[in-house]
């Protein structure tokens, strides 16, 4: 299972990369805007840190504009993956980019059939948003299960990125299902590392060691 970090914050990316647990990065317009930096420069900086896929989202909604923007984004670095919204024009763009050898990540996927269409169009990745489905009383992980089954049935190479992860349980459930990738906020990565019994154990070992030194 691969872990991506869901952030555009350079410090968070550096810390997670140095720990050795992440394989890529996902960003979106909101995350980039939050950093208050020029987006292209920021994406270049991220690509210099992480030796893996870095998703950058096209904000245009019309096919011609989306395609043009996507091609420009792809020129930033060879690791850039173009994030495309799950719309009709988005699918057309994915199809064209796929034909040009440009990797894509279809985002805002909320149904198995949307994921199926994205895979048919040639998407490299699809991103089902589990947390947002949970927010409206739908079990988001059921969506991931359904997508996995469909992709296995038909031998699609498209990888599933479990997105909108809110807590460590989402990561555990994604791993149990066998999802290809989980994209995780830095705050949740820190939660995954820590456990109260680990802290208690370390404290006890240190106390016992200090007694020995006396």
From Swiss-Prot:
Q: Which UniProt keywords apply?
A: Cytoplasm, Pentose shunt, Schiff base, Transferase
Give a Pfam family name.
Answer: TAL_FSA
Specify the pathway: Carbohydrate degradation; pentose phosphate pathway; D-glyceraldehyde 3-phosphate and beta-D-fructose 6-phosphate from D-ribose 5-phosphate and D-xylulose 5-phosphate (non-oxidative stage): step 2/3
Catalyzed reactions per annotation: D-sedoheptulose 7-phosphate + D-glyceraldehyde 3-phosphate = D-erythrose 4-phosphate + beta-D-fructose 6-phosphate
Q: Which leading EC class covers this enzyme?
A: transferase
- Return the SUPFAM superfamilies for the record: Aldolase
Task: Quote the subcellular location field of this record.
Answer: Cytoplasm
InterPro entries (alphabetical): Aldolase_TIM, TAL/FSA, Transaldolase_3B, Transaldolase_3B/F6P_aldolase, Transaldolase_AS, TSA/FSA_arc/bac
Q: Which HAMAP family match?
A: Transaldolase_3b (MF_00494)
The identity of this protein, by name, is Probable transaldolase
What species is given as this protein's source? Thermodesulfovibrio yellowstonii (strain ATCC 51303 / DSM 11347 / YP87)
Q: Which gene encodes it?
A: tal
